C-alpha cells in the first residue's frame, strides 16, 4: 500500500492535487491505480478547521467517475453542520465509508462507528477482530451514547452561543487576546500575555475549570468548545478567568 499525503500545511484538499496524482500513478513505468481517497474533516492538526464542502463535492464526483472509493475521517463531523450549514447526511452522501467517534461527541468511554453500504460492512468484523476489537463486554464503553446523540447538534450550537458571550466578556479586558480559527469549528485561540501558564491552569482548576496546556512555543491556549460549557454561565466563567 502506497500512501500519498496531500494538502500539506492546509486543511482543504483540492481536486487539482488529486487529479495530478491519479494521472501520475496511472502513467508510471508500472501503472498503479489509486484505489481510495481519505479525507479528514474537521482536521485535528489544523485546529479543527473544516474542509471546503464545495471542493468535497467536486472530489466526490471525480472519484466516482474514475472508480475511486472515498472515505471520510469524520471523528468530529457532528460539529460541521453549525459552521457549514451542511447536514451530516449531506457530508456522508459524498463518501463510501464514514468514521465517527463516539467519545469525542457523545461521551462514550471509547469506541467509534464505521458506516458504509452492506457490501462493505458485511464481514468487517473479521478485520475488527484482527486488531483486537472483539471484546465480549465492550457495551459499557458506549452505554451512555444514546443519551447524548439526539441532542448533540442542538447542544453544540448552544455551546457556541455561550462561548461567544464568554469571548465578548474576556475581550472587554485587554489582558486577554482571542482569535477565532478561519474555517474553524470547535476551537478558538486564547493568549494571556505576562501570565505564567502553570499558575493560571492551577488557579482555574481550583474553581472547577480545566484548562488545556498552552502551545510550548507561542503560549497560546487551544480552547475546545463543547457542551461542558453549559454547566455554568459565561459570566461565572469570565470571573474565573479575570480573577
Which functions belong to the PLM regions below?
Residues 49-81:
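Catalytic PLP-binding core of fold-type I/II PLP enzymes
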Residues 36, 67-71, 97, 220-222:
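Structural preference for beta-strand elements that scaffold enzyme active sites
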Residues 171, 175-242:
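Conserved C-terminal alpha-helix-loop-beta "cap" of PLP-dependent enzymes
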Residues 3, 70-71, 211:
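Hydrophobic beta-strand scaffold residues
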Residues 43, 76-78, 104, 227-229:
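Active-site-proximal loop/turn and secondary-structure-junction residues that shape catalytic pockets
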Residues 81-89:
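Distinct, well-ordered alpha-helical segments
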Residues 1-46, 50-55:
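PLP-dependent aminotransferase-class I/II
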Residues 33-45, 50, 87, 93-174, ...:
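Active-site C-terminal subdomain of aminotransferase-like
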Amino acid at each position: 500500500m502506497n500512501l500519498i499525503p496531500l494538502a500539506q500545511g492546509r486543511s482543504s484538499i483540492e481536486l487539482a492535487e488529486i487529479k495530478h496524482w491519479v494521472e501520475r500513478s496511472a502513467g508510471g513505468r508500472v501503472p498503479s491505480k489509486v484505489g481510495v481517497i481519505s479525507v479528514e474533516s474537521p482536521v485535528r492538526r489544523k485546529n479543527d478547521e473544516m474542509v471546503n464542502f464545495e471542493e468535497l463535492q467536486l472530489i466526490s464526483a471525480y472519484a466516482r467517475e474514475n472508480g475511486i472509493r472515498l472515505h471520510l475521517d469524520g471523528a468530529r463531523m457532528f460539529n460541521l453542520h453549525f459552521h457549514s450549514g451542511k447536514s451530516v447526511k449531506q457530508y456522508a452522501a459524498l463518501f463510501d465509508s464514514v468514521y465517527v467517534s463516539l467519545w469525542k461527541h457523545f461521551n462514550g468511554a471509547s469506541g467509534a462507528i464505521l458506516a458504509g453500504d452492506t457490501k462493505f460492512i458485511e464481514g468487517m468484523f473479521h478485520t475488527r477482530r484482527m486488531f483486537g476489537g472483539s471484546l465480549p463486554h465492550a457495551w459499557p464503553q458506549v452505554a451512555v451514547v444514546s443519551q447524548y446523540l439526539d441532542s448533540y447538534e442542538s447542544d453544540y450550537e448552544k455551546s457556541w452561543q455561550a462561548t461567544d458571550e464568554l469571548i465578548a466578556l474576556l475581550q472587554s479586558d485587554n489582558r486577554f487576546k482571542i482569535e477565532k480559527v478561519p474555517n474553524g469549528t470547535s476551537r478558538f485561540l486564547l493568549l494571556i500575555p505576562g501570565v505564567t501558564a502553570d499558575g493560571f491552569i492551577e488557579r482555574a482548576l481550583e474553581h472547577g475549570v480545566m484548562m488545556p496546556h498552552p502551545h510550548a512555543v507561542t503560549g497560546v491556549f487551544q480552547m475546545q468548545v463543547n457542551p461542558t460549557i453549559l454547566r455554568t454561565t459565561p459570566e461565572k466563567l469570565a470571573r474565573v478567568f479575570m480573577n
